[in-house]
Regions:
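Bacterial N-terminal signal peptides that target proteins for export
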Residues: 1-6
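Short amphipathic alpha-helices in soluble, non-transmembrane regions
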Residues: 70-83
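Non-catalytic propeptide/linker segments at domain boundaries
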Residues: 80-111
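N-terminal signal peptide c-region/cleavage motif recognized by signal peptidases
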Residues: 14-15
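N-terminal, post-signal-peptide region of Sec/Tat-exported proteins
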Residues: 34-73
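Residue-level detector of anion-binding/catalytic polar loops
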Residues: 50, 80, 139
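Helical hinge/lid and interdomain linker segments adjacent to catalytic or ligand-binding clefts
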Residues: 22-32, 62-72, 115, 119-188
Length: 188
C-alpha cells in the first residue's frame, strides 16, 4: 500500500513538474464559460503575460505559460482549462503550422484599451455589448458624442458601437432606436 501511495504521489508531482502551459479550450462542450474565458485572457494580458491565441484550433483556444495565479483565477471564474507540458504545446503548434490546415497561432501581448459608444446613464444590462464585457470582467470606458467631438478616441485601441440587436429590439418594442448620423466600429 505504501509503495502505491508513493508511486501515485511521484506521478502526480512528475505530471506538474513538466507541465508548463495552460490551455484554455474554447470549443463547445469543453469550455464551461466562454465569456469568462475571454475575461481570463484579458486579465492575463493586463498582467503583461503573452498569450498564444490558437485560431480555429478547438474553437480558438488560448495557450498561456503556466503560473499558479492564472490557474487559480480560472478556478475562481469557473473557466475550463488543461495543464499541458511543453511537448504537448509544441505538438499542437506543429499541427496548426501545417499549411493544409486553416489554423494559425497569433501572439497577444497587450490588453487593448476598450471604449463602448453608448450614452451616459445606460446600465451594463441595457445593451448586449456592455453586458458581455461586464460579465467577462473586461474593463471598458463609455464614450458618446462629446468624447467623439473632443477627439478623445485616440486614447483607445478598440471602439465598439451599440449592438445592432439592441436597435432591432427597440424597434420591435415600438421605441425609437438611437439616432446617429454615422454607424461605425473603429479599430485603432
Amino acid at each position: 500500500m505504501y509503495k502505491f501511495i508513493s508511486l501515485t504521489t511521484l506521478l502526480f508531482f512528475f505530471k506538474f513538474s513538466i507541465a508548463s502551459k495552460i490551455l484554455i479550450p474554447m470549443d463547445n462542450g469543453e469550455q464551461n464559460n466562454h465569456l469568462k474565458a475571454y475575461g481570463i485572457a484579458y486579465w492575463v494580458l493586463q498582467n503583461d503575460i503573452e498569450i498564444e491565441w490558437l485560431l480555429n484550433y478547438r474553437g480558438g483556444s488560448f495557450l498561456i505559460d503556466y503560473f499558479k495565479t492564472i490557474e487559480e483565477e480560472c478556478i475562481i471564474r469557473g473557466v475550463s482549462y488543461d495543464i499541458i507540458a511543453d511537448v504537448q504545446a509544441n505538438q499542437i503548434k506543429t499541427i496548426i503550422s501545417d499549411p493544409e490546415v486553416n489554423q494559425q497561432v497569433v501572439k497577444l501581448q497587450k490588453a487593448p484599451k476598450i471604449a463602448v459608444y453608448t450614452p451616459d446613464g445606460k446600465q451594463p444590462w441595457d445593451d448586449a455589448v456592455t453586458l458581455v464585457l461586464s460579465y467577462a470582467e473586461i474593463p471598458y470606458d463609455k464614450v458618446y458624442d462629446s468624447e467623439v467631438i473632443s477627439d478623445q478616441l485616440m486614447k483607445y485601441d478598440w471602439l465598439q458601437e451599440q449592438d445592432d440587436e439592441d436597435k432591432r429590439e427597440a424597434i420591435r418594442l415600438g421605441l425609437d432606436p438611437p439616432k446617429r448620423k454615422n454607424k461605425f466600429t473603429l479599430y485603432l
